[in-house]
């Protein structure tokens, strides 16, 4: 917080000022991997204000009515995005992710079995929800390729 206070006081934000509309009219769905924070924009030649960046574990669309689709809808229908890119990377932590192992990690960090059981009772299928993917290229095709086409692509 001290850094942020100094940043604001010194007006460090001024060089980042832009509006909410992406200059390149692109939305990018990518992984939240820390290695991509600076690497992905550098590799694509994008800067602050160019694109709408949506990040999650694995860069996947895990539910047709989830937050990724909602974010893409806002980007497209409210903010002028005309192109969506789904970008994966090598050595992704979500690849080969085990739902059973993650549940064990949750328990080790204090989540009680009764909490997990209650969530399952509410309809959450932990096994499929927490499962990663086996193949990066197939994941991009499934979660970002022909699986989700706009009506303009199918006419």
What residue spans do the PLM features occupy?
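Short Gly/aromatic-enriched secondary-structure transition segments
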Residues: 41-46
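A short beta-strand-loop structural module common to alpha/beta enzyme folds
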Residues: 51-58
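Divalent-metal-activated hydrolytic enzyme cores
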Residues: 1-24, 59-68, 76-81, 92-155
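Short, charged/polar surface micro-motifs in flexible loops or helix N-caps
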Residues: 33-35
């Amino acid at each position: 917080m001290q850094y942020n206070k100094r940043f604001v006081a010194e007006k460090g934000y001024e060089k980042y000022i832009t509006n909410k509309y992406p200059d390149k009219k692109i939305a990018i769905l990518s992984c939240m991997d820390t290695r991509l924070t600076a690497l992905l924009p550098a590799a694509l030649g994008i800067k602050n204000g160019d694109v709408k960046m949506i990040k999650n574990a694995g860069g996947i669309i895990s539910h047709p009515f989830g937050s990724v689709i909602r974010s893409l809808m806002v980007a497209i229908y409210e903010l002028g995005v005309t192109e969506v890119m789904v970008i994966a990377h090598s050595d992704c932590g979500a690849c080969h992710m085990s739902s059973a192992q993650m549940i064990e990690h949750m328990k080790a960090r204090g989540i009680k079995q009764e909490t997990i059981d209650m969530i399952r009772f509410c309809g959450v299928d932990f096994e499929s929800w927490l499962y990663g993917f086996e193949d990066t290229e197939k994941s991009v095709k499934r979660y970002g390729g022909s699986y989700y086409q706009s009506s303009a692509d199918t006419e």
